[in-house]
Amino acid sequence: MAKEIILGIDLGTTNSVVAIIENQKPVVLENPNGKTTTPSVVAFKNNEEIVGDAAKRQLETNPEAIASIKRLMGTDKTVRANERDYKPEEISAKILAYLKEYAEKKIGHKVTKAVITVPAYFDNAQREATKNAGKIAGLQVERIINEPTAAALAFGLDKTEKEMKVLVYDLGGGTFDVSVLELSGGTFEVLSTSGDNHLGGDDWDNEIVNWLVKKIKEEYDFDPKSDKMALTRLKEEAEKTKINLSNQSVSTVSLPFLGMGKNGPINVELELKRSEFEKMTAHLIDRTRKPIVDALKQAKIEASDLDEVLLVGGSTRMPAVQSMIEHTLNKKPNRSINPDEVVAIGAAIQGGVLAGEISDVLLLDVTPLTLGIETLGGIATPLIPRNTTIPVTKSQIFSTAEDNQTEVTISVVQGERQLAADNKMLGRFNLSGIEAAPRGLPQIEVSFSIDVNGITTVSAKDKKTGKEQTITIKNTSTLSEEEINKMIQEAEENREADALKKDKIETTVRAEGLINQLEKSITDQGEKIDPKQKELLEKQIQELKDLLKEEKTDELKLKLDQIEAAAQSFAQATAQQANTSESDPKADDSNTIDAEIKQD
């Protein structure tokens, strides 16, 4: 019987790679064209599906050639081709099926399992979509792991005994990511992520294309953009030139018979110096510097704390990129593994772990943004803070906001702002069948659980009746890395203003709760209450109501402190008079949070 093999797949925006473990060592598999990288492009022509290099060559000439589908994963958008609409998962599945097919030919037997990598900032919907793409392609996705974690595995950092902090600089074809990881005791933990979801090696290619178009117009009186085939050749040559300039100071651009000019065929011969190329792309290099600084800041470390800097993505071969990294971090980056293949190698290693081929490595990833629920007054109450290591399960006890409330709405939010409305709404569900009781008495346990693949499940349970509702968050809109960073930045910029709003809301909720409590005490005690005590309570209630109307938060807080102390003394005196030791049911659970779930 053939030994179980689990494919390690880097399903990239621009290119994809597949690797396996063979004799306990990672091996990157070549596609039918003899390359280890396969363009993540699918084209349809005459009812035929074309994937990879052949499809990429049709991008300019075939309107039914589809690239960068990874950007749409997890959304409800579709792409039109072959006289029908395709979901992003379906197109990704065709890429995965192609990788699976040529991997099986290399291996010599069928393979049904895979580990697939995703960016660390991918949300639940994007991760679920990736798993579904694998399923459509005939693959059982054993694990979804973050790309920077896979890179660290590939570099063998799990074999190091000492604690390490590592920065992964990933410049792909269409996206750019920076991640900071911590390695301790053979475990990886992603501390932070940053980047630019619309920056990649293609942008460097485009600068060369623009330079070529300008030069060809000036020297040959021909506009390559007017001819789709000519433009395709220009883009191919631009990529080759970029690669050449990583190893040599000058590259010759040769494009024979590019098109027809006034005087016959146009044969282009141009030279581009590395110094010119670096000058025209300096602004792109600069765009990668800020995410490095941001990632370090989020991880709360200095550049001097880094033990390793790892390079991922073919574009990191550019000398200007390496020079900028070394200058910014004062550390030479590790270039010991092919940057095009490193993520797939890491995925294959994780596959080897799952297949029992490699001794166990524990991978720890983190949540990119805080997860919580909306509580009374519109407060965003966090349950799982940003950068919490996953897998994780956290629970908190909440209660009702109204007397005799039998149903609560659980609104799940994601973000760093203190008010729910300022964060991203991920989903909501109702828990009904709560036993009627005074506000604050029912105990509703809300639990968040995030599994190893980053999929979030939220449940709410009435501890008395046992009634429970659960949802798996599968939001149809996704967050790009820029949006995540923007949310973090907005939270920082609005921290003081948000804190004031939150303080006002919490004080209002506290005052309304005390008014409710005092009015209930007067009603419950009836004639037993001392007239003078009753008059004092009614006066205090009115003072609170007046301050609420006037929205004087500071005065209201002072008055609350005074009245709460008086109310406590009154409650103790009443209890002694009644000669009862009956205690407040809420006092038995120190974990009950003093924030109630609002009634929808």
UniProtKB/Swiss-Prot annotation:
Keywords: ATP-binding, Chaperone, Nucleotide-binding, Phosphoprotein, Stress response. The gene is dnaK. This is Chaperone protein DnaK. GO terms for molecular function: ATP binding; ATP-dependent protein folding chaperone; unfolded protein binding. NCBIfam families: PRK00290.1, prok_dnaK. Residues 569-578 have a biased composition (Low complexity). The modification Phosphothreonine is found at residue 175. Belongs to the heat shock protein 70 family. Pfam families: HSP70 (PF00012). It comes from Mesomycoplasma hyopneumoniae (strain J / ATCC 25934 / NCTC 10110). It comes from the Bacteria. Induction: By stress conditions e.g. heat shock. Signal peptide: none annotated. Acts as a chaperone. Residues 569-600 are annotated as: Disordered. CDD domains: ASKHA_NBD_HSP70_DnaK-like. The keyword Nucleotide-binding applies. Residues 583-600 have a biased composition (Basic and acidic residues).
